Design a protein with these regions (language model features):
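Surface-exposed amphipathic alpha-helical segments
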Residues: 18, 38, 140-172
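A mature extracytoplasmic/lumenal domain signature
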Residues: 36-38, 66, 120-121, 146-148
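Sec-dependent N-terminal signal peptides
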Residues: 3-13, 17
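C-terminal charged interaction modules
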Residues: 131-143
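Conserved polar/disulfide-associated segments of primarily extracytoplasmic proteins
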Residues: 46-134
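Stable alpha-helical elements in mature extracytoplasmic
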Residues: 34, 79-82, 86, 90, ...
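N-terminal "mature-domain start" segment
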Residues: 18-48
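Residue-level detection of beta-strand-connecting loop/turn positions
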Residues: 28-29, 113, 125, 139
Length: 172
C-alpha cells in the first residue's frame, strides 16, 4: 500500500485555487515557490504530499507535516534529532521493504537541516530512481522528492536543496 502511495501520491486538496504557476499554498500553512512554472496534479491524503509536474517532465512531490503527528515523534527532540528520526523512519522503511528497492544515502547535512537520499526500484518494467530531501522547518517534517530519468543528479540535488532552502516558507 505504501509503495502505491509513494509512487502515486495524489489526491484532491486546496492549492490556492490554481492548477499551474510557480507559487502554491499547501496545507493552508506553507508557501511553496518553484523556480519555474509547474502544474499541480493532486495531493495524497495519507502522506500529505502534493504532486507537481514541470516542463522537464519531472515529478516533484512536496509535503510539510506537523512532526507531532508522526509515529516516530518524541517530545523534547531538537531540530537535528527530529530530522534524524524522520530520515531514519522513512529510510528504514524502504530499506526493509519487500519490493527490492535499493536505498542509498546521498549526503547528510544536519547542520543545514536536511538529508538527501535515494530510492531505486523496478516498477512495471521501468527503473524508477527517486531522489529525496528530508528536512525539518519550524518543527514540521519536510519531504521533497523528484523523479526525472533525463535530469543529471547534480541538477536534481540543486533543485531539491534550493526548493528546501529558498522555496518553502511559512505563510502569514
Amino acid at each position: 500500500m505504501r509503495v502505491f502511495l509513494f509512487l502515486m501520491l495524489f489526491f484532491n486538496s486546496f492549492v490556492w485555487a490554481q492548477q499551474e504557476g510557480n507559487k502554491f499554498l499547501i496545507n493552508n500553512d506553507y508557501l511553496v515557490q518553484f523556480p519555474e512554472s509547474v502544474k499541480y496534479i493532486r495531493t495524497d491524503e495519507n502522506s500529505g504530499a502534493f504532486l507537481f509536474h514541470d516542463k522537464q517532465n519531472s515529478n516533484i512531490q512536496v509535503s510539510v507535516r506537523p512532526s507531532q503527528n508522526m509515529e516516530f515523534y518524541k517530545e523534547g527532540l531538537s531540530q537535528t534529532e527530529l530530522l534524524e528520526a524522520f530520515y531514519k523512519w522513512d529510510f528504514d522503511f524502504w530499506k526493509s521493504n519487500t519490493i527490492n528497492a535499493k536505498v542509498t544515502e546521498i549526503s547528510k547535512k544536519l547542520s543545514e537541516g536536511y538529508v538527501l537520499w535515494g530510492i531505486e526500484l523496478d516498477y512495471e518494467s521501468q527503473k524508477i530512481n527517486q531522489i529525496i530531501l528530508s528536512g525539518v522547518k519550524e518543527n514540521n517534517v519536510v519531504f521533497i522528492s523528484i523523479i526525472n530519468p533525463k535530469m543529471k543528479m547534480n541538477e536534481k540535488k540543486k533543485l531539491l536543496i534550493d526548493l528546501y532552502k529558498k522555496g518553502i516558507s511559512k505563510h502569514n
